[in-house]
Amino acid sequence: MKVVLASPRGFCAGVNRAINIVEKTIQVYGTPIYVRHELVHNDYVVTQLSKKGVIFIERLNEVPNGSVLIFSAHGVSKKIQEQSKIKNLIIIDATCPLVTKVHKEVSRANRNDMEVILIGHSGHPEVEGTMGQYISVNSRQKIYLVESQADAWSVQVNQPNHLFFVTQTTLSIDDTAEIIAILNKRFPNIMGPRKNDICYATFNRQNALKNLAPMVEMIFVVGSITSSNSVRLMELGRRIGKITYLISHANDIQKNWLRGVNNIGITAGASAPDILVLQVIEKLRVLSTDHVVVEEMIGEEENIFFDTPKI
């Protein structure tokens, strides 16, 4: 059996930065420290940090006054920021800089009295945080969430000639392009960011999967079901026509999946550590009746690094 590893895969600069922030915060303040929402959407990462004394919460009333609170890589709304100040919390912001970029775009459009369309998935914490950057001062100023092409065709805005769009950073490149095309057709004067809001890591991992697909019969995407970019990779693999499984850890693999399969591709979402990929390879060695040969495809080299704030 041949196993081909997608490149790039796994951790992005924003995830590395968020984890480094938590590690440094533990060194400076000790434990417990609190993180609003999962720092990143990966069960393994959350479990490892929990073992070190990190407490993950969803509501601010779970955090004692004066405690250390870290905002997750997905970002938070302005309302959450203000509520945190009232509780006299020590706030450390691990929001990915590329998410912060989108927040600034929304705030700028808001200040310029523009309405905003956010392309994203309802309920995702990044979307909640981005929606929460917009403050409506009257009934004609709103931010709208568009999740699909159908939404793009049906959304009704108050100011079609004074409109700006942004996107969640972890969307399907192809789906988002189709939605933007519809918005441009419906609202010829709509404006958007000068640089794509979909982050480099999402873009690179989806392109890597497209390049990987012709080499293999089956694809494993290593990542959690709550990880937007991991789910998008799974959907992309299936859209291309490959049998594709999203697995959070090696034990998810079933032996009958491998019957008659000689070439398997592996990729990993931007919040999945490489140790999980290594565990998947070892699991395949155990389950396969053949010798397993591992190859890594040539892909886009990533050397992006985000500085961590002073703790």
Curated annotation (Swiss-Prot):
EC number of the protein: 1.17.7.4
Cofactor(s) listed in the protein's UniProt record: [4Fe-4S] cluster
Cofactor notes: Binds 1 [4Fe-4S] cluster per subunit.
GO biological process, one term: dimethylallyl diphosphate biosynthetic process
This protein's pathway: Isoprenoid biosynthesis; dimethylallyl diphosphate biosynthesis; dimethylallyl diphosphate from (2E)-4-hydroxy-3-methylbutenyl diphosphate: step 1/1; Isoprenoid biosynthesis; isopentenyl diphosphate biosynthesis via DXP pathway; isopentenyl diphosphate from 1-deoxy-D-xylulose 5-phosphate: step 6/6
Binding-site residues for (2E)-4-hydroxy-3-methylbut-2-enyl diphosphate, renumbered to this chain: H41, H74, H124, T169, S227, S228, N229, S271
Reactions catalysed according to its record: isopentenyl diphosphate + 2 oxidized [2Fe-2S]-[ferredoxin] + H2O = (2E)-4-hydroxy-3-methylbut-2-enyl diphosphate + 2 reduced [2Fe-2S]-[ferredoxin] + 2 H(+); dimethylallyl diphosphate + 2 oxidized [2Fe-2S]-[ferredoxin] + H2O = (2E)-4-hydroxy-3-methylbut-2-enyl diphosphate + 2 reduced [2Fe-2S]-[ferredoxin] + 2 H(+)
Keywords of this entry: 4Fe-4S, Iron, Iron-sulfur, Isoprene biosynthesis, Metal-binding, Oxidoreductase
Residues involved in [4Fe-4S] cluster binding: C12, C96, C199
Residue sites binding dimethylallyl diphosphate per the record: H41, H74, H124, S227, S228, N229, S271
InterPro entries: LytB/IspH (IPR003451)
Active-site residue numbers: E126
GO MF, one example: metal ion binding
Keyword Metal-binding included in the entry's annotation: yes
Binding site for isopentenyl diphosphate: H41, H74, H124, S227, S228, N229, S271
Keyword Acetylation on entry: no
PANTHER family found in the cross-reference section: 4-HYDROXY-3-METHYLBUT-2-ENYL DIPHOSPHATE REDUCTASE (PTHR30426:SF0)
Function field: Catalyzes the conversion of 1-hydroxy-2-methyl-2-(E)-butenyl 4-diphosphate (HMBPP) into a mixture of isopentenyl diphosphate (IPP) and dimethylallyl diphosphate (DMAPP). Acts in the terminal step of the DOXP/MEP pathway for isoprenoid precursor biosynthesis.
Subunit structure: Homodimer.
Family membership noted in the UniProt record: Belongs to the IspH family.
Protein name: 4-hydroxy-3-methylbut-2-enyl diphosphate reductase
Species, as recorded: Blochmanniella pennsylvanica (strain BPEN)
The organism's taxonomic lineage, starting at the top: Bacteria, Pseudomonadati, Pseudomonadota, Gammaproteobacteria, Enterobacterales
